[in-house]
UniProtKB/Swiss-Prot annotation:
Gene Ontology CC terms, in alphabetical order: cytoplasm; nucleoid
Entry similarity comment: Belongs to the MraZ family.
Localization: Cytoplasm, Nucleoid
Protein name (database record): Transcriptional regulator MraZ
Lineage of source species: Bacteria, Bacillati, Bacillota, Bacilli, Bacillales
Length: 143
């Protein structure tokens, strides 16, 4: 399980250091793709395979299902660590997430999310005030 929040810088070549505990959980080979809310999602291979199976079962006759799977899979790339524990984030994914220099890496249960520092701070500031309301709505899901 991934949890926690860390700040790191991305270098001019697009390489980002991921915290050691997240590297361990992601394994030697993992998948990064476009995430929701203008961030990136990183999945260990086993989680990615499970997600892929669920998404493959969506009805391709539905426009929303086609649009989502196109967006999600076209941005996906398999990654490995370099000797310094960094991952090279492709330019298209850096652009999607607005990554310039400072990044925030967060653990979210079965995945790691990578945010530009500015977008994370904006998202957090907007969401923090409604945390209680969101929690009340989740009661409907028996959480």
């Amino acid at each position: 399980m991934f949890m926690g929040e860390y700040q790191h810088s991305i270098d001019e070549k697009g390489r980002l250091t991921i915290p050691a505990k997240f590297r361990e959980g992601l394994g030697t080979s993992f998948v990064i793709t476009r995430g929701l809310d203008q961030c990136l999602f990183a999945y260990p291979q086993d989680e990615w395979k499970q997600l892929e199976e669920r998404l493959k079962s969506l009805p391709f006759t539905k426009a929303d299902a086609r649009a989502f799977t196109r967006f999600f899979f076209s941005g996906a790339t398999e990654c490995e660590w370099d000797k310094q524990g960094r991952v090279n984030i492709p330019p298209n994914l850096r652009e999607h997430a607005g990554m310039q220099k400072e990044c925030v890496i967060i653990g979210v249960s079965n995945r790691v999310e990578v945010w530009s520092k500015e977008r994370w701070e904006d998202y957090f500031a907007q969401s923090e005030g409604s945390f209680g309301e969101i929690a009340e709505k989740l009661v409907d899901f028996n959480l």
